[in-house]
UniProtKB/Swiss-Prot annotation:
Pfam families: YbaB_DNA_bd (PF02575). This is Nucleoid-associated protein Sfum_2790. Binds to DNA and alters its conformation. May be involved in regulation of gene expression, nucleoid organization and DNA protection. Keywords: Cytoplasm, DNA-binding. It comes from Syntrophobacter fumaroxidans (strain DSM 10017 / MPOB). One of its GO terms (cellular component) is bacterial nucleoid. Its main location: cytoplasm. InterPro entries: YbaB-like_sf, YbaB/EbfC.
Length: 110
């Protein structure tokens, strides 16, 4: 097997691992916000797809219509998770774009 000059696959893999570890730490600190019901239910999700907070406006709390509240929470959380995944994909794309590893393909990053 002939390797091109200047290409050290182990060094490239180590660099990728280091960058990925740093990115995971950074994503834990970055957040997105999402809401449903015109802001009646709001959530904050970090870049690791962890829900950090849920806020529910008192006006939407109706003991006679719990299903509506549940639907709003689900909608807000799903929107927050989607936004978080998009943010994470963009950040990971920055890492992948800076590396030149022939044959390496990571779904969603290239």
């Amino acid at each position: 097997m002939v390797m091109s000059r200047g290409f050290n696959p182990m060094q490239q893999v180590k660099a990728l691992q280091d960058k990925m570890a740093r990115m995971q730490e950074e994503l834990a600190l970055k957040t997105v916000e999402a809401s449903a019901g015109g802001g009646m239910v709001a959530v904050v999700v970090n870049g690791r797809q962890e829900v950090l907070s849920v806020k529910v406006d008192r006006q939407v709390v109706d003991p006679e219509d719990i299903e509506m509240l549940q639907d709003l929470i689900v909608a807000a959380v799903n929107d927050g998770l989607r936004k978080s995944q998009e943010m994470a994909a963009q950040e990971m794309g920055k890492i992948a774009g800076g590396l030149n590893i022939p044959g390496l393909k990571i779904p969603g990053l290239f």
